Regions:
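Generic beta-strand/beta-sheet core signal
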Residues: 167, 250, 261, 324-327, ...
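Long, highly charged, low-complexity intrinsically disordered interaction regions
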Residues: 179-246
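Metal-dependent nuclease catalytic cores that hydrolyze phosphodiester bonds in DNA/RNA
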Residues: 1-124
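Conserved DEDDh/DEDDy metal-dependent 3′-5′ exonuclease domain
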Residues: 81, 93-95, 99-125, 129-197, ...
Length: 405
């Protein structure tokens, strides 16, 4: 959002932010209005790298389109003023009216909305909008932005595009029906406009509940610190959002309150076993937190068995066991990605006190294939020697990546 000449102007990015998290929008508004005493965090290295590779992908597609089409018009990025935005939007409208094949960085501005579409390309059915993304699939946010641009084309008098197109890093073009996305766009836009009309306010609680969008949000550090400072229930390992909401309604708002809660504090909407498990987890974490020091930031970790079923599922240890981790660069090879490290730890050489780490590096698709083959061969050899061995890994990334390879 921007305040231009006293009025709010929103962008497709703001629509995506509102779709992901209304709290983010509230903080953004308060910040722009100068109401907040805190600032959002700086972009981390991954976001900077993503922007760099995304820009390179966009320029590569531009050169590809210039080679394919006779008329490609590039609209310069306008300054942040209504006059400059009007001028850039007029240039875009003139290019479209002239029937050019491609408009790069097409500017749309209707005094309330501003946007810069990567590519507007003329096809058999008229103009349609394309967005370049290094992702391996068309994400909801990209489709929402494309739908907003498509409605801007309709506002200028052109037929509403029937398709939305995402140009992926591997040059695959994923297309989706605009009709599938417009209802979401209309709902999100109505919510955002209502929020803008109500004006900026400082939320009663600076931090927001944890959600999937936190990983890519510039407010994540502020919210995370707020949850830590207030000892929020989201700190309890394994706590779902709906569970914390039920506990808050019952008057339990901190991890300490939950850990010390009597049986009578259980919400009627929560099962006994679930309440007892979450309460025990909170109690263990409170105990650990009390033992943390500057010399020992982890503190004393304790455990409590609620059920041995999960423990029984763990296999017996084997001297041939392997602890495996992979590292990948999702932006390498034009967005196709590259698994550049296959690393594993074994203990059969010198025992558990002296584990051996074996790295297999790959810096090209050919080397990635060779590294994959080397790792699989090594595991098959170990399995032949230790039939009771297992490979341990964290989360599902390794299984998914190996299956893909």
């Amino acid at each position: 959002m921007q305040l231009l000449d006293g009025g709010w102007v929103y962008s497709p990015t703001d629509l995506v932010a509102r779709m992901d998290c209304d709290h983010r929008t509230a903080l953004d508004l308060a910040l722009k209005a100068g109401l907040l005493p805190v600032e959002p965090g700086e972009a981390d290295g991954m976001h900077v790298l993503a922007g760099k590779h995304g820009g390179a992908h966009e320029r590569r597609v531009l050169e590809l389109l210039r080679a394919r089409h006779e008329t490609v018009v590039e609209i310069d990025q306008p300054a942040n003023s209504r006059a400059a935005l009007r001028a850039a939007a007029a240039q875009t409208a003139e290019a479209l009216a002239a029937g050019v094949d491609v408009v790069f960085q097409a500017t749309f501005f209707d005094e309330h909305f501003r946007g810069h579409a990567d590519f507007v390309i003329r096809g058999a059915d008229g103009y349609e909008v394309y967005d370049t993304k290094l992702a391996r699939s068309a994400k909801p946010g990209a489709l929402l932005q494309l739908a907003a641009y498509s409605e801007q084309l309709e506002r200028l008098g052109y037929p509403l595009p029937r398709q939305l197109h995402v140009w992926l890093g591997n040059d695959e073009i994923v297309s989706r029906s605009v009709d599938d996305v417009l209802p979401v766009l209309h709902r999100v836009r109505a919510d955002l406009l209502t929020q803008l009309a109500n004006g900026p306010v400082i939320p009663p609680r600076i931090w927001g509940d944890r959600r999937s969008a936190c990983g890519s949000c510039h407010w994540s550090e502020v919210c995370g610190q707020g949850r830590d400072d207030d000892r929020d229930l989201s700190l309890v390992a394994g706590m779902r959002g709906d569970q914390s909401a039920r506990l808050r309604e019952a008057g339990l708002v901190t991890i300490e309150q939950l850990g010390a809660a009597p049986d009578s504090a259980r919400p009627d909407t929560m099962g006994v076993a679930t309440f007892e498990r979450l309460r025990a987890q909170a109690r263990l974490q409170v105990t650990q937190d009390a033992t943390r020091t500057s010399a020992d930031p982890v503190g004393k970790v304790t455990s409590e068995y609620f059920s041995s079923d999960g423990v029984r599922l763990l296999p017996r240890s084997s001297v041939g066991d392997v602890w495996f981790d992979m590292e990948g660069d999702p932006f390498a090879e034009g967005g196709a990605g590259l698994e550049y490290l296959f690393g594993y730890v074994t203990i059969d050489q010198d025992g558990e006190d002296n584990p051996l780490f074996t790295p297999i590096w790959a810096h090209s698709p050919q080397a990635e294939k060779a590294a994959f083959e080397q790792f699989v061969d090594a595991m098959e050899a170990r399995l032949a020697h230790w039939p009771d061995m297992h490979i341990y890994h964290y989360a599902n990334y390794e299984r998914t990546a190996l299956t893909r390879l």
